[in-house]
């Protein structure tokens, strides 16, 4: 899909986002406990998203909240990155709780560097699926929808987390993830911010609430 000057497509080398099925931006901000909320422009917001993704000192400090997009509200930033082990448990529980409040909540991580994909699908307080390509042992639930179809097309009849990690099929799958990227799943389940036309309303910037971290992330040595 196309875009407009006022609402550019959201891109980042490592893109993490939460999406909640509601048009009430204020309630999402409240439910997340976000602080120091302020208006921004789309251009500045999108630029900030990529800057924060590269921020090694405070990667989890800032998020960008979109206006409603096709019935969903997105909150973007590494704070919601499932592959960052210091975040995984926290954001999983957070997404589950948000789904209990709003009906549906989802998390996604997409790497333009082809070094990882992740998603979490929650509905009505239940985790239906969590997949983190770098940590298959952390998978929850059953593949469904486009994930299931692409696995079947690749000849994987079970779950990818059950594959022999030293086997040929697992290695071939991991080379491209069978084109089953987070953006692919998001396109079917909710909103893919790399292609969706965003609302012309104004996004917000906010500080994310701190939480106790058991250890710093070491994924790819970036943070």
Regions found by a protein language model. Give the residues of each.
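Short, flexible coil/linker segments at or flanking structured domains
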Residues: 3-8, 16, 63, 95, ...
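Short, intrinsically disordered low-complexity segments
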Residues: 37-132
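Long, compositionally biased intrinsically disordered terminal regions
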Residues: 115-116, 123-124, 128-223
């Amino acid at each position: 899909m196309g875009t407009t000057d006022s609402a550019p497509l959201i891109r980042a080398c490592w893109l993490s986002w939460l999406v909640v099925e509601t048009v009430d931006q204020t309630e999402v901000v409240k439910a997340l406990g976000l602080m120091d909320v302020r208006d921004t422009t789309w251009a500045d917001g999108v630029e900030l998203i990529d800057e924060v993704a590269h921020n090694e000192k405070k990667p989890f400090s800032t998020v960008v909240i979109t206006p409603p997009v096709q019935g969903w509200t997105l909150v973007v930033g590494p704070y919601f990155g499932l592959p960052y082990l210091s975040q995984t448990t926290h954001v999983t529980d957070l997404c589950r709780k948000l789904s209990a409040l709003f009906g549906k909540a989802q998390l996604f991580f997409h790497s333009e560097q082809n070094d990882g994909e992740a998603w979490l699908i929650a509905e009505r307080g239940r985790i239906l699926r969590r997949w983190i390509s770098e940590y298959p042992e952390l998978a929850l639930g059953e593949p469904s929808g486009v994930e299931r179809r692409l696995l079947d097309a690749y000849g994987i009849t079970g779950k990818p987390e059950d594959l022999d990690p030293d086997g040929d099929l697992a290695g071939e799958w991991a080379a491209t993830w069978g084109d089953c990227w987070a953006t692919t799943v998001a396109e079917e389940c909710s909103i893919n911010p790399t292609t969706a036309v965003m609302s012309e309303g104004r996004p917000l910037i906010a500080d994310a609430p701190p939480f106790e971290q058991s250890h710093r992330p070491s994924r790819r040595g970036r943070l």
